[in-house]
Amino acid sequence: MVKINGEELNIAGKTVAEYLATTKYDPKRIAVERNGDIVPKVQYADTVLQDGDSVEVVSFVGGG
């Protein structure tokens, strides 16, 4: 199980890019943290989520 934003999901073995494709997140407007480290956008397709990972997806919103 992978914990994403506090929710346990059975997505071990998928890449960050594969997970994001199943969500409504806009990859241009988010940051992904995996086990305390920011995942660079260029590595989303190569970063495989593993059992026990803790992931936070943070969305950026405009404002003023």
Model-derived regions, located:
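Ubiquitin-like/PB1-type beta-grasp interaction modules and other compact soluble beta-rich domains
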Residues: 1-63
